[in-house]
């Protein structure tokens, strides 16, 4: 019902146009219960004055004549040659002998028409002949089908775009002039266009062509900004009172550079312990093929700590004393991938290479690092090369703010390509999976739905070192507190010094879009565990290894502003006993993160 009683969230204002719509909703409700002769015979309006609230209040009474309840007596199909009767009958959602349901009856007719439509038969005629037997109270139908030849695409036109080039839009639609029309291919193209993030609306329109059995596909788009300029300040707790607890960042990114669909971005980050300058570029249609090429360059300076050998009476202590050192690094990376787009999902196979050159600075007269990967880069630039390959299946309805669907990926990365010139040789495996369900989608007004989406993720990461090769601390797996184990990783908490070769990270989120496609309120819960080796992840994992967190958050789903603002309470179980995060106790912690999309 569009007319709502006044309450905390409804104004209760009367609109005459809604009255007729509500009458039709009432009739449909009865028709779905088998009362096909139901009628609204009168609408009685009574106005009273509420002296306490000083307003007129209207009471509306619908007078309904229900009539008799009917059962469905089946559907006979005539005129079909292209598809067998058994196949068409299987699309009928009403079973013979069931209570007649008008909505399911119409859905059955639409499903039969869609089968033809999806296979290019857009000019067919469908003429249902409904028969009502008032004595037996049965409803039957004879569907007459007038089959015509397949329709072909004459032209594909684009309207509404002012920045984006026509070819950027047309290449996402898997149809060309002369092709047989396919509804599924049109839907696949629309999904691809939405996932570009360039448009707030994509509306298809099928028009008759210049001749019979020719159609024109018109795609009308509404562009949105693809350029993002961000400046930010984040605050974090530090244990050093002389440290500057502020991190500054600035980003510039255009994901549709000059309307060509290419992405160019620059990022600058500055904090007390890290400064980064990075550039990146990507082209999703490299060489005008469905190939994604990306490249990046970065310069970093980090202030780090590492264990060092401390000679004490009676031996050497190598587990309690930390040294400070600085690292200057340069990084280059490039990747090339190919994608295959199907009706149910898109598959991407990508390979890449990365080169990092790093040099460490510290007083070698005072310190000898325990980690040999630190000392190997002292006084000279050490090199670290890696190659990787990744396969990903994406069946999410919308890439940046999904309501349904799933995603799965597997990546293998080998680090260490030059014998004797590099200090680390290991394989890293990353397995990821996501799934989304819409739990509720109820219209509350003409422009807003109350919607809840359940999102779930799990991921496994493993490191396998080559025989005799160490893995430095910077490459080991850990809880970062921003993307996994949100709310943890504060200085001095139970997770801050935990690193390993195996990590299992999962989360579940209940999302309520406030402005769909812009931002939503979320409630999240994270679970994460880190173990020394992959084998121990499967043989020695216990409840003591898990770190938990939960809390509310505000998530921005615009590609140009992918921020997440969260308040996280974190805890763990130790020998079955509840234990708060030792750094935040039960007060919680503010977490600034980014809404990154797995691809």
Residue map of PLM features:
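Outer-membrane beta-barrel transmembrane domain signature
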Residues: 527-549
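Periplasmic polypeptide-binding modules associated with outer-membrane biogenesis and secretion
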Residues: 1-239, 247, 251, 265-285, ...
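Gram-negative/organellar outer-membrane beta-barrel architecture
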Residues: 12, 179-400, 406-407, 452, ...
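Flexible, surface-exposed loop regions and adjacent strand-edge segments
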Residues: 78, 160-162, 310-316, 365-373, ...
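Outer-membrane beta-barrel and related beta-rich outer-membrane complex signature
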Residues: 305-309, 357-367, 422, 445, ...
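Extracytoplasmic gating/loop element in the C-terminal half of outer-membrane beta-barrel translocons
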Residues: 211, 215, 442-528, 532-534
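Transmembrane beta-barrel strand/turn architecture of Gram-negative outer membrane proteins
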Residues: 264-266, 328-337, 353, 406-416, ...
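Hydrophobic, well-ordered secondary-structure elements that form the walls
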Residues: 193, 252, 281, 391, ...
